[in-house]
Amino acid sequence: IFSYGIILLLHLIKQSAENRTTRSWNLSIRNSVKQIQRSNSREKAKGTYMSETELAATLEDAYDLALEKAAIEAFEGQYEAEELSKLVQQEEIIKKAMNLIWER
């Protein structure tokens, strides 16, 4: 879940910072969301392994790595992670990720 969280956040950060999207980013977002949902789903017991709070904490933990990767990719690598962080709202990105994962 952590690894897919990094990929999901990476593309949401790029979308927010660059104020645009690509088909490739959209596909990566959909794939990451699906993989997180599958990994977190309990088949036999029905329900999830991680609560909403635990999942949010995992995404918050993954955010810094996603931001570092996004700094390399967004704007062709012109910004350092610190500079890029000023262009986006961490809370909003994590909220969007949670809404996608929980299908809200």
What are the residue ranges of the model-derived segments?
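Surface/interface-facing alpha-helical segments and adjacent flexible terminal/loop regions used
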Residues: 1-104
